[in-house]
């Protein structure tokens, strides 16, 4: 099942309160970028982020899920995307790690 435009728009609206987030549509799903750095995506109406040291600490209670069939890289399923302070901290720290 592809991600709906409504879910995509809602996630982007929430995330843009925490940082400059953009998306790129790919095969019905969306890759997510913060300040030009790929950090996650929206897959089948699920907001997933890459595994980094920060995401492992801050999202330790969140399940790991595969973004699509055949993927070998599990990602964290994030449910607190409406919490602006939490998302700002998560994105800022993750982007620094990914850019290293």
What feature does the model see in each segment?
Residues 1-100:
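Charge-dense, helix-prone N-terminal extensions
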């Amino acid at each position: 099942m592809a991600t709906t435009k409504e879910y995509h728009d809602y996630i982007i609206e929430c995330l843009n309160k925490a940082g400059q987030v953009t998306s790129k549509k790919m095969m019905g799903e969306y890759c997510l970028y913060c300040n030009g750095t790929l950090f996650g995506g929206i897959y089948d109406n699920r907001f997933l982020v890459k595994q980094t040291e920060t995401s492992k600490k801050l999202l330790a209670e969140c399940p790991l899920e595969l973004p699509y069939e055949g993927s070998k890289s599990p990602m964290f399923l994030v449910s607190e995307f409406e919490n602006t302070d939490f998302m700002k901290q998560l994105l800022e720290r993750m982007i620094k790690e990914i850019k290293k």
